[in-house]
Amino acid sequence: QLDTVFSRMERPLLLKLYLDDRPVCEELECFITALGELSDKLKVQIADRAASSDTAPCVQICWEDGIQTGLAFHGIPSGHEFTSFVLGLYNAAGPGQILEEPVRQQIAAITKKTDMKILVTLSCTMCPDLVVAAQRIAAENPNVSAHVYDIRHFEKLKAKFNVMSVPCLVINDEEVSFGKKNIQQVLDIILKG
């Protein structure tokens, strides 16, 4: 299945790792290195081995030239988040999942910088839908970023946004909403903001 997704990717991607000295970062490095070996369209680079604990562990999805696509995963994209991470790669590299024209137009209408944080756990079955929706929007519009956080490794964020349940969507560090959402529901929140 992975071969099919990777073979359809239109352009190569660079996966940049931001690590520190915790075992979870070593685990992320092994995980992403192994993933990178599955396709010649994925290159892996260690960007920082002494990254801040606010960032690490993190894998940023970048274009081949190192420019960020706006998609990133903070933690290890395994469990229920593995498929959504692979879809994020596919959506960033193109052609991506098919979008209805009205949805594409709404995504194009986002003109202000929109930073989305999606707080998840790897065992959450409702989180991937929101992750995929947010990443699809970010992959389509350079004004939008979608950073996914496994909150087990980011207690400060959990406390800052008073996260009692996941998924939790935070837009521009201000607008906080909880629960499963599709792409239209995410767009409604962004566009009314």
Language-model segments: residues:
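N-terminal leader/targeting and pre-domain segments
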Residues: Q1-P12, S84-T111
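Short, surface-exposed acidic/glycine-rich loop or hinge patches that mediate macromolecular interfaces
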Residues: R22, I76, T121-C124, I151-R152, ...
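Thiol-based oxidoreductase modules, predominantly thioredoxin-like and allied folds used
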Residues: D20, D40-A51, P142-K156
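Short, conserved beta-strand segments within well-ordered enzyme catalytic domains
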Residues: L14-K16, Q45, Q60
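Local sequence-structure signature of Cys/Sec-based thiol-disulfide redox active-site neighborhoods
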Residues: L2-S39, A108-P142
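Structured core of small recognition/catalytic domains
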Residues: C127-G193
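Structural micro-motif
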Residues: P12, A50-L71, K158-N172
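Non-catalytic, surface beta->alpha helical segment in thiol-disulfide oxidoreductase systems
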Residues: I61-G96, V170-G193
